[in-house]
Amino acid sequence: MTYPIVLAHGVCRFDVLLKDTLNLDNTDTPELDNLHYFKGIRTMLKNKGYVVYHSNVAWAAGLEKRADDLKENLLNILKETRAKKINIIAHSMGGLDARHMMFNDRNDGEIHKYVASLTTISTPHEGSPFADWGLDNLTSLHSLIQKLGIDLSALKDLRTDTCKTFNEHQAVKEFETTCKDTTKFQTYAGKQNFWGVFSGLKIPFEIIRKTEGENDGMVSVRSARWRDEYFKGTMDKTDHLNEIGWWDPDQLLANEGPEELLQRIHNFYAGIAGQLP
């Protein structure tokens, strides 16, 4: 039987205002699960017999805080299920949360020993040129947001130079190489063209395209690969929101309606789950 699956969300989950009010993370109501960041994916996987949970980490916070939150999530799930290990399927920054969690806890609780697999979907392992651009060009806006008490530390942690420093840290490289013996790592990317990408992602799409090429409107294929040995493939005609089941009118240019997209994405996640330990 497959170990429990945790769906780890990205940096700014857009269902943040509804998740507590409607208990979206734990709902067993399909209609409510369709409002979740991972649109109906938990319900679909549960119907196939998997034990599935959602992560719940701080909105737009830095990686240290988010990694701690994710660790607490996993420990609670391990206690509740009495499972020996957990599978993580992470979208976007959720993959970085998991990597930092495993590394930070390597000499303490050794949470990595309880992670059977880490699958990342469009995770910016090499950072995001859009984060670089935002911090370099929108400093006044960023300062105003901070004065309002809104934590956007995640943007700094998503800078390309910050991610490069982490990836090239000798201790990180040695640790993650050792982890391959007990944890299955695999990565996926998404890509879309300018006309098909969600309207709100067209500016970051162009910023990323000019420096890193093919991307999904938030993360380049290059950044999502992590290591070539882990890379499983690219979802074509799929932007950053499509990857978690959310349709937008621009997708009509790919001749794909909302029901067709959702079914395709659900099939994608079901395929991943079917190969997990």
Short names for language-model regions:
Residues T178-P277:
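C-terminal catalytic-base region of ester-bond hydrolases, centering on the histidine
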Residues M1-I86:
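Active-site catalytic motif of lipid deacylating hydrolases and related acyltransferases
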Residues A58, G94, P124, A189-K191, ...:
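Catalytic metal-binding/acid-base residues of hydrolase active sites
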Residues V6, Y53, T119, Q186-Y188, ...:
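Hydrophobic/aromatic beta-strand patches that form the interior of the parallel beta-sheet core
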Residues M44-V51, E174-T183:
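A structural motif corresponding to the C-terminal end of an alpha-helix
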Residues F14-V16, G62-L63, L96-A98, E126-F130, ...:
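Short catalytic/ligand-binding loop motif for oxyanion handling, primarily in non-cytosolic enzymes
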Residues H9, D68-K173, D216:
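Serine-dependent carboxylesterase/thioesterase catalytic core
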Residues T21-L24, W133-N137, L201-P204:
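Short secondary-structure boundary/capping segments
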